[in-house]
């Protein structure tokens, strides 16, 4: 692998990292879900909801857990947000939400895409300062093709990715 897209934070020796864009997290819900009547979602609105998550070891799962301190984890039995079901990919989580198995938190670009592909889905932003992540390019310091990295960065930054803002 020469160059990767990765969510920050990411720190490895001899790896260069260049932020590309920031992206808010939003809630993906079925159109008929009670939370669909709300314009914005408070974190307390998720209390006692079945929030579908990525499986253990996935960086996005860790980002959601950090953003939602009430998420029910093994080390936090008092948490009020339940996570009973896990998916292996963002696409799987979208299908699970469309099937009525629960709700999920997604990067906004993924949630917009899911909503555009499936009219049974809705997205809602979080109230106040929304949880977010930064996506970056990363490559080895010894990688000799710097112009290739520059061309990739330029191509990504010149494209329109709904739900993101350039870093």
Where are these regions (language model features)?
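Short beta-strand-centered segments that line the small-molecule binding cleft or hinge
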Residues: 1-29, 93, 98-101, 121-124
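Short beta-strand and adjacent tight-turn residues that come in two discontinuous sequence segments
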Residues: 1-7, 86-88, 105-107, 111
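Short beta-strand-to-loop elements that line the ligand-binding cleft
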Residues: 7-8, 53-54, 75-89
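Short secondary-structure boundary segments
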Residues: 8-9, 31, 57-58, 108-110, ...
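Short Pro/Gly-enriched coil loops immediately N-terminal to beta-strands
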Residues: 15-31, 39-47, 126-135
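Residues embedded in well-ordered beta-strands
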Residues: 26-28, 34, 52, 103, ...
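Secondary-structure junction motif
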Residues: 50-75, 145-154, 159-164
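A late-sequence structural motif
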Residues: 101, 121-166
């Amino acid at each position: 692998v020469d160059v990767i897209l990765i969510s920050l934070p990411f720190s490895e020796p001899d790896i260069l990292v260049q932020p590309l864009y920031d992206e808010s997290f939003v809630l993906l819900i079925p159109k008929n879900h009670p939370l669909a009547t709300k314009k914005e979602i408070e974190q307390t609105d998720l209390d006692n909801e079945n929030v579908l998550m990525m499986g253990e070891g996935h960086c996005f799962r860790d980002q959601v857990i950090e953003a939602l301190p009430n998420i029910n984890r093994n080390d936090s039995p008092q948490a009020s947000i339940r996570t009973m079901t896990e998916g292996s990919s963002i696409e799987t989580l979208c299908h699970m939400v469309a099937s009525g198995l629960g709700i999920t938190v997604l990067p906004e670009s993924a949630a917009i895409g899911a909503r555009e592909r499936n009219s049974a889905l809705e997205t809602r932003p979080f109230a106040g300062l929304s949880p977010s992540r930064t996506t970056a390019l990363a490559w080895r310091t010894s990688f000799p093709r710097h112009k290739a990295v520059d061309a990739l960065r330029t191509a990504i930054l010149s494209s329109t990715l709904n739900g993101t803002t350039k870093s």
